[in-house]
A protein has these predicted regions:
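N-terminal nucleotide/polyanion-binding subdomain common to many enzyme families
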Residues: 1-88
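Structural motif
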Residues: 36-38, 64, 104, 156-160, ...
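Short glycine-rich anion-binding loops that position phosphate/pyrophosphate groups of nucleotides
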Residues: 40-43, 161-166, 185-186
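A short, gly/pro- and small-residue-rich
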Residues: 51-59, 167-188
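Conserved beta-alpha
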Residues: 71-148, 152
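A transmembrane-helix-recognition feature enriched in membrane-embedded lipid enzymes
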Residues: 71-72, 195-246
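Short, flexible loop segments at boundaries between secondary-structure elements
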Residues: 134-138, 177-213
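Proline-aspartate-enriched helix->loop->beta-strand connector
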Residues: 149-163
């Protein structure tokens, strides 16, 4: 059984990038519905507060720690958990594909997914973009969107609807391929938003770069101190429980 690292209510297998890619490639070749979710601190906090959402994430075949906050929290539990951002993982999956992968892109505003698809096809020769659709559709159109996607027979479905909508959509529809929740990745690939410089990303400062790009994220940034406090309280509670059982 693979070792797991707990951060609040979530349990991660501490994969390296190579290990995560190997696991994902095996899921693709196995066929059928499989899910990759990429929780950051905000998503992990929501999971801790919402048991149903936590259970949803736990059903993923692959759970990757996207934010530096999750990896730092693991250290407070005395564990090492390599950070694997969703966008880096998706790009590596396309770059190292052992064969041509059929890819469908779902999310973003009108035109964003199409432009992102062109960019990905130009960068990754083994990425065959078989469909691209914006993410602004009502709940009653979900089945039609699902039918469009399944008709394209993708190996990979990048679902960029934002959390928790993207995870809930994947769980309700269960597309018969490897679905990856990727938040705002399409905006980056389409060229509408820039990623932080590599040095800043490696230093764990990508969240600050995003905040400077989009000051409206300040409301969401409030989840970071709340997450840190929740982790500290959880660690203290577990420590006190262990001492009490001695």
């Amino acid at each position: 059984m693979e070792r797991e690292v707990r951060v609040l209510s979530l349990h991660f297998t501490p994969y390296t990038m190579e290990g995560a890619l190997t696991r994902a490639q095996a899921l693709i070749e196995a066929g059928g519905c499989a899910r990759v979710y990429t929780p950051n601190a905000e998503i992990a906090l929501r999971a801790a507060r919402t048991p149903a959402f936590s259970d949803m994430l736990a059903r993923a075949e692959l759970l990757l720690p996207d934010g530096v906050g999750v990896s730092l929290a693991a250290r407070l539990y005395g564990e090492q958990l390599p950070r694997l951002t969703g966008i880096d993982f998706a790009e590596a999956l396309l770059a190292r594909a052992p064969r041509r992968y059929r890819v469908y892109l779902l999310g973003g505003k009108a035109g964003v997914a199409v432009r992102a698809g062109r960019a990905l096809a130009g960068r990754y020769p083994r990425a065959e973009i078989v469909g691209a659709r914006h993410g602004y559709f009502p709940r009653e159109e979900e089945r039609r969107v699902y039918d469009e996607i399944t008709a394209a027979r993708p190996d990979l479905l990048f679902v960029c609807l934002g959390s928790p909508r993207q995870e809930e959509w994947i769980e309700r529809l269960r597309p018969p391929c490897l679905s990856i929740g990727l938040g705002g990745a399409l905006d980056v690939w389409a060229g509408d938003k820039a990623r932080a410089p590599r040095a800043l990303r490696q230093a764990g400062g990508e969240w600050l770069f995003r905040l400077l790009q989009d000051p409206s994220r300040i409301v969401r940034a409030g989840a970071l101190p709340a997450f840190a406090l929740r982790v500290l309280l959880d660690r203290w509670h577990n420590h006190a429980k262990c001492r009490g059982s001695v």
